[in-house]
């Protein structure tokens, strides 16, 4: 894990950074960059929801099914009993929330990369603060890329956990009209809060998001850095490659965390008044394994992997194109 790669977006900033001479100018450049990261991440998150919601609804229905079922059966029953628009049940909350979550993921990831850039430079006693932007401290070991993504995942979990729980509970409602337990996102929030369950599933979310996003950003940044190593600037990398890199990164994320995501979904969909699974990762794992074996941890795996490529390809491509539109070199 000692191999180093050029930090994407940091290398392409070098020309601009060479022109910065005063502390105020450096602070202004840093603030502008943070705002761009947040805005581009928000738009990327919206694209993620629009592309991925139908896949996600199917996945959650499979994960939380109490009897054995198949993807085709879920799709057939959902369309027959609830209509095509049922694929977008619970979409309002993630549409608003996932944009914020993705902006946090990207924003924290970029902030951590700059932290490690300065930290690595500080270990060189012969390097002045003016040299930092031009030295090999602009490259990071793979382990630091992982920590950057992991930190973004853990921080983001405090937003993602309640948002995902609301979406899961709305997605798994099969009743219509007055028989529904939750009338919508706000009603769901009020009832979860009243039961003290709004943050249920936070710990498994933190583990999943931390390791998952560590892998996610590590894979993507390494692939982009390889392209930069061939002599291209970040803005010269073809959009189709950025989309492909994002798709591959998302696939690797889910390969590493999927069983835990199943456990998390079950905990977050458990009965609020009489929880069956005691809000315990180990209890859920033992219970579902005893009932269905190892296959219980891979319910909905097919739709998730099919979803992963287009969703994450769209997320990273949108982020990169927005950054280019904003004039980020």
Curated annotation (Swiss-Prot):
It comes from the Eukaryota. Residues 1-33 form a transit peptide. Residues 1-27 are annotated as: Disordered. Solcar repeats lie at residues 34-115, 143-226, 238-325. It is a multi-pass membrane protein. GO terms for molecular function: glycine transmembrane transporter activity; organic acid transmembrane transporter activity. GO terms for cellular component: mitochondrial inner membrane; mitochondrion. The chain crosses the membrane at residues 38-58, 84-104, 140-160, 205-225, 243-263, 297-318. Keywords: Membrane, Mitochondrion, Mitochondrion inner membrane, Repeat, Transit peptide, Transmembrane, Transmembrane helix, Transport. The keyword Transport applies. One of its GO terms (biological process) is mitochondrial L-ornithine transmembrane transport. PANTHER family: CARRIER PROTEIN YMC2, MITOCHONDRIAL-RELATED, MITOCHONDRIAL BASIC AMINO ACIDS TRANSPORTER-RELATED. Present with 1050 molecules/cell in log phase SD medium. This is Carrier protein YMC2, mitochondrial.
């Amino acid at each position: 894990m000692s191999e180093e790669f050029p930090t994407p977006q940091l290398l392409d900033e070098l020309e601009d950074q060479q022109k910065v001479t005063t502390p105020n100018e450096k602070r202004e450049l840093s603030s502008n960059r943070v705002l761009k990261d947040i805005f581009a991440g928000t738009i990327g998150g919206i694209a993620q929801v629009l592309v991925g919601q139908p896949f996600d609804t199917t996945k959650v229905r499979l994960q939380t099914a109490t009897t054995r079922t198949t993807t085709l059966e879920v799709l057939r029953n959902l369309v027959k009993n609830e209509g095509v628009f049922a694929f977008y049940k619970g979409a309002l909350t993630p549409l608003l929330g996932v944009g914020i979550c993705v902006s946090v993921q990207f924003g924290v990831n970029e902030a951590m990369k700059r932290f490690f850039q300065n930290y690595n430079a500080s270990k060189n006693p012969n390097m002045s603060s003016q040299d930092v932007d031009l030295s090999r401290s602009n490259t990071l070991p793979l382990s630091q890329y992982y920590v950057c993504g992991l930190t973004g995942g853990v921080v983001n979990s405090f937003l993602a956990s309640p948002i995902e729980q609301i979406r899961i509970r709305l997605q798994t409602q099969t009743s219509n009209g007055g028989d529904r337990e939750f009338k919508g996102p706000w009603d769901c929030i009020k009832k979860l809060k009243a039961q003290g369950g709004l943050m249920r599933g936070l710990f498994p979310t933190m583990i999943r998001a931390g390791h998952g996003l560590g892998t996610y950003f590590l894979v993507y940044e390494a692939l982009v850095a390889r392209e930069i190593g061939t002599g291209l600037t970040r803005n010269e990398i073809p959009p189709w490659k950025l989309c492909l890199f994002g798709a591959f990164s998302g696939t690797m994320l889910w390969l590493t965390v999927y069983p835990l995501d199943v456990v998390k979904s079950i905990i977050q969909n458990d009965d609020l008044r009489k929880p069956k699974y005691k809000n315990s990762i180990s209890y859920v794992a033992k219970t579902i394994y005893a009932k269905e074996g190892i296959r219980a941890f891979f319910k909905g795996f097919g739709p998730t992997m099919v979803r992963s490529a287009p969703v994450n390809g769209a997320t990273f491509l949108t982020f990169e194109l927005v950054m280019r539109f904003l004039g980020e070199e």
